[in-house]
A protein has these predicted regions:
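A generic structural signal for tightly packed, nonpolar segments enriched in small/aliphatic residues
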Residues: 3-6, 10-185
Length: 185
């Protein structure tokens, strides 16, 4: 048959073959929701799935574009492959707008390859602003033989997200501490 052409705008055409994994956070959330419903767990669970289509079109984002988040914060796009953090930020804003009462909010994401570089493929990173919840999650992971490693929300790295054009950067400016700046975003 006729050979199809592929358009690849990533560093390596092989990396595109792994992009299905970018839906991992949503898959985890749906799996948890299904498990809780299956056992009739008496919890009030709200599931919010911010989703994106990454197809290329004339409306696609470009590096250095400034877009506005749901709460009208101007965001300068540092890398178009970092769309997940924009989605998560908008989902958190949605939670605030909806005045959803909750004991805590969990989000799951394949946010950066930087966490994988730091911790490898078998040890997920955990970020939290709640020390007690973080300890509980880490301890439960150890019990279930599914460990995680807590990384810091190191506030001084917030300055890497600042831009001179009154926008914040979606990716940070230094290229270091990338997993942390993604979580801070």
């Amino acid at each position: 048959g006729r050979r199809q052409r592929q358009m690849c705008i990533r560093d390596s055409s092989n990396s595109m073959l792994l992009m299905k994994k970018d839906m991992g956070g949503s898959a985890v959330v749906l799996g948890i929701a299904y498990a809780l419903m299956s056992i009739n767990c008496p919890v009030n669970l709200r599931v919010i799935l911010p989703l994106a289509e990454n197809a290329v079109s004339e409306k696609s984002m470009r590096p250095l574009d400034v877009v506005y988040s749901r709460n009208q914060t101007p965001v300068e796009i540092g890398n178009t492959d970092a769309e997940g953090r924009l989605l998560l930020a908008d989902a958190l804003t949605y939670c605030q707008e909806s005045k959803i009462k909750s004991d805590f909010i969990l989000d799951f994401a394949t946010l950066t390859g930087a966490a994988r570089v730091a911790l490898g493929t078998e040890l997920p990173a955990l970020f939290t602003n709640n020390d007690n919840l973080g300890k509980d999650i880490i301890n439960e992971g150890i019990k279930q033989i599914d460990p995680m490693w807590r990384l810091p929300l190191f506030k001084p790295y917030n300055k890497q997200l600042d831009k001179n054009n009154n926008a914040i950067s979606s990716t940070g400016s230094s290229g270091t501490g990338v997993a942390i700046t993604a979580a801070l975003f």
